[in-house]
Amino acid sequence: MVDNTYGHYAYRISGGYLFHSVPYLKAANNTLETEEYNKLGTFASLGCVRMCVRDVLWLYENCPQGTTVDIYDDAANPGPLGKPESIKIPLDSPNAGWDPTDPDETNPWHKESATLSGVQDITVKVGDTVDFLKGVTAKDTCGNDITDKIAVSGRYTTDAAGEYTMKYQVTDAIGSIATAEMK
């Protein structure tokens, strides 16, 4: 690639334009240019389409040569699948240098996952109001705050005494899911 960098699963679109992973400094899975990875979803290349390893590998394995691909370049109409969200890698992470979606079995991100914290059983008096998200936080696989993505489900009423179960779930940008319950 350009500037003596490397890419995984380069797949030609047309001419000099490719689908490929974010650049790597060497031909090794742990040399990802993390700053460039964090630009996924923005204009950051010389015309190629940069993707996380999971997605470009899917194209590489599932789209034979000659497959028609429609590329959307319109924020108002990002296509039928929408614009994918990307996860950000903290530059000071000991796992920086690895794409969190790389299926390589030695990828240290595979030991990480989305998390929920602060979910605990509570007691509420009849007639009181309750904030099920009070004190509850969530982090994605890379440790970024995704508290605003928490979904809470369950049936309850504060009009009558009883025991109710509420379920919490959060899914991060790479599909890692954390769940918890409280009563």
Q: Where are the regions that the model predicts?
A:
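Short beta-strands and strand-coil junctions in structured, solvent-facing domains, enriched
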Residues: 57-58, 139, 172-176
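Solvent-exposed, low-complexity, repeat-rich "mucin-like" stalks and linkers
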Residues: 111-144
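Solvent-exposed, conformationally flexible loop/turn segments
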Residues: 1, 125-129, 161-162
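Short, isolated positions in well-ordered beta-strands
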Residues: 18-19, 130, 146, 178
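Exported/periplasmic cell-wall-interacting domains
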Residues: 2-112
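Serine/threonine-rich, repeat-prone extracellular segments and beta-strand-based repeat modules
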Residues: 122, 144-182
